[in-house]
Amino acid sequence: MQTIESGTLLISDPFLKDPNFLRSVVLICDHHGEGTTGFILNKKHQKNFNDFIGGIEHIHFPVYYGGPVELDSLHFIHTKPDLIEGGLPITDDVFWGGDFSQALLGISTGLISPRDLRFYIGYSRLVSWST
């Protein structure tokens, strides 16, 4: 049995029938005894960041569909721990979340680009169980 850890990429089976994960690549962000959490990397949402967050018209970052769980939640992964405190490490270079106001400030000042940070609506969750 293979172990899954943060930073692992899962590629969907080509014959998978679940439309949520059809032709998907999922980045595992957290894995422990109670389940696994990740984000679908390759499904861009039809709306941009400013369509979801009112009053922030100057931020035109794309948003990605992270998965079918909690579609009313906004998450982000980034490569700027020096500018965004509090992120959880996924790999040595990639972090999940952190101080949202610091992320917005970095974007507004041009220190953070779409190459450095991605927003996700919803997330993917696999729950562990035993038989």
Regions inferred by a protein language model and the residue ranges of each:
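A short aromatic-anchored loop/beta-hairpin motif
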Residues: M1-Y120, S124-T131
